[in-house]
From Swiss-Prot:
Record organism: Ligilactobacillus salivarius (strain UCC118) (Lactobacillus salivarius)
Source organism, top-level taxon: Bacteria
Protein name: UPF0122 protein LSL_0628
One Pfam entry name: UPF0122
Similarity section: Belongs to the UPF0122 family.
HAMAP family assigned: UPF0122 (MF_00245)
Function: Might take part in the signal recognition particle (SRP) pathway. This is inferred from the conservation of its genetic proximity to ftsY/ffh. May be a regulatory protein.
Length: 112
């Protein structure tokens, strides 16, 4: 499993988790966040590996569909990038303005 895919699914899961069913949340959470294998999940929930695999793949598609319509993750990335650019600019050009730096740092902490 590629690290980029894992990171993306985890990020999408963070944004869209409340829109998933309890089973989808459980399987995706165990597989991507907790690094369980398909076999471990199947054993814990007394279902086949194929059932777990199918559920996870369907849920990945659902998460991608939500993102294609709502763009929450993309917008978060763009806002983060712009905030980083703003902070860099202020540090380079207005380093003496402690109030401005403080306010930007507060904005950054709101993202977390």
């Amino acid at each position: 499993m590629a690290i980029e895919k894992t990171n993306r699914i985890n990020a999408l899961f963070d944004f869209y988790e409340p829109l998933l069913t309890p089973k989808q949340m459980t399987y995706i959470g165990l597989y991507y966040r907790d690094d369980y294998s398909l076999g471990e999940i199947a054993e814990n929930y007394e279902v086949s590996r194929q059932a777990v695999y199918d559920n996870i793949r369907r849920t990945e598609k659902i998460l991608e569909e939500y993102e294609s319509k709502l763009h929450l993750y993309r917008n978060f990335q763009l806002q983060s990038e712009e905030l980083d650019n703003l902070l860099k600019y202020v540090e380079e050009n207005y380093a003496y303005d402690k109030e401005l730096l403080t306010r930007i740092n507060r904005l950054e902490s709101l993202e977390e």
